[in-house]
């Protein structure tokens, strides 16, 4: 009898531990816990990778265009100390995707046609016009965006900064990392994009429309 009781205690103890373990496994983890710190740490890691790219990876960083655009005289003369959040960071498929040759730069007033997806650092997708893996031979759903100086509240500084360095028909999509200071700031946007969110965009420019482009006959 004592042996049976002993085994029963052992079995119950094992079941209790099992249930306790299951309960811990099913605890709901807040994906936005310590959100500011996680995003700042994530951006620091991206800045480090961009500064010291692994073999075979192509990275560039682009300065927030508004630093010089808002006050070109004072910003060019003052010893401004750039921070990691003063840049957007772009990972390209190849070095050839960076160099534009004689292609005109994207500028204010232009319209760009592009395929894109937007994500947060926890993998939550918040926007886009395609799903899954981008394939330039298959993807044909492009959205046109006007390039504006943040007149429209839907535009963010980092989005415009990145677009101004894109070119059409790259070998593949580029991945753009935008710090929250160049995104939706401390307040965020809507229910999905919380404050302090680093924005990650997969971006492929299909076409650039220059409304004021002149021809040789106009010169």
Where do the protein language model's features map onto the residues?
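Cross-family detector of peptidyl-prolyl cis-trans isomerase
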Residues: 2-5, 22-219
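Sec-dependent N-terminal signal peptides
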Residues: 6-16
């Amino acid at each position: 009898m004592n042996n049976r009781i002993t085994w029963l205690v052992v079995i119950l103890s094992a079941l209790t531990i099992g249930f306790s373990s299951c309960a811990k496994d099913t605890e709901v983890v807040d994906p936005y816990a310590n959100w500011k710190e996680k995003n700042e740490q994530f951006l620091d890691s991206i800045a480090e990778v961009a500064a010291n790219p692994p073999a075979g990876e192509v990275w560039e960083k682009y300065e927030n265009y508004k630093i010089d655009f808002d006050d070109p005289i004072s910003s060019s003369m003052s010893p401004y100390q750039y921070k990691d959040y003063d840049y957007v960071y772009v990972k390209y498929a190849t070095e050839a995707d960076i160099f534009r040759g004689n292609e005109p730069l994207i500028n204010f007033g232009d319209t760009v046609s592009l395929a894109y997806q937007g994500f947060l650092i926890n993998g939550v997708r918040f926007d886009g016009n395609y799903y899954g893996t981008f394939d330039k031979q298959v993807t044909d759903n492009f959205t046109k965006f006007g390039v504006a100086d943040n007149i429209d509240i839907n535009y963010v500084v980092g989005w415009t900064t990145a677009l101004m360095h894109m070119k059409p028909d790259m070998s593949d999509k580029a991945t753009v990392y935008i710090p929250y200071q160049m995104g939706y700031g401390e307040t965020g946007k809507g229910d999905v994009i919380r404050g302090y969110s680093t924005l990650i965009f997969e971006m492929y420019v299909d076409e650039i429309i220059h409304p004021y482009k002149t021809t040789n006959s106009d010169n």
